[in-house]
Amino acid sequence: MLSALGLGALVYTIIEAPARGWTALPTVLGFCAAAVLVVLFARREIHASQPMLDLALFRDRRFTAASVAVAVSFFALYGFIFLITQYFQFLRNYGPLETGLRILPVATCVAIGSVAGTVLVVRLGNKLVVTAGLLSLAVAYAWIATASGATSYREIVGQMVFLGLGMGLTSAPATESIMGAVQADKAGVGSAVNDATREVGGTLGVAVIGSVFASFYTARFHDLPRLPGGLTQQATESVGAAFTIAGQLPAAPAGALRAAASTGFYDGLHAGCLVASGVALVGAAVAAVALPARPAEKG
């Protein structure tokens, strides 16, 4: 319960921060509440006779670094899906099916990267492979941050190749490291932590990247002439809503609204991608420092 409340408070605060302000009192209190709940959860687990999560496992640098790597990889993947679907549907005017087909290179490269990762780990070790995967994610996001209306689909495919391969190279070897770091009688706990890091990483990816995106997107509407009936506020909710509203307006205000929404979208896309790239770089640094080159054999 405490863990769910803590994560829920954190995600809710991050999502609401663009509207309330990152330094507003409700936002600060939300982050404080999330921190308190997480600390209470940790203390409860430490003193429990049969803890739901054995925090002692995180004393193992291999286990901790691999968990961070898995979380970061899913942070990147879910954040990318959040951004790219809007880009294809609203900025490129593709339908849902067309959008899904154009994202297929990511899934294909994740599969290829996962297979390649398990092979490369045998020759190169977990540290090098996982670090390379996270660096590939960082490169992918830094490249995506340069996207504009003139970006060709071929270039986007290149970005997706880096992202998919990075995801595959990271997640499969990191998962092996998590499971390899626990004793046989703790395998269930290791599997649960692996699943939890994926879910938490993905959830935070959408929340953090989405909130950064929203902060920059809405900023473009501040200088826009007010529209009747609260339409300006509705337009700030999403680029799709802005384009729908623009279709109901006369030519002049419609053009201004579309321009603000398009520019705001790219502002948010660039900022969100740079944040994600930074997170991937931090994950790569953790993997490079904490993951062993070759895991010790268990006796």
Language-model features: where?
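Transmembrane core module of solute transporters
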Residues: 1-3, 7-15, 20-185, 189, ...
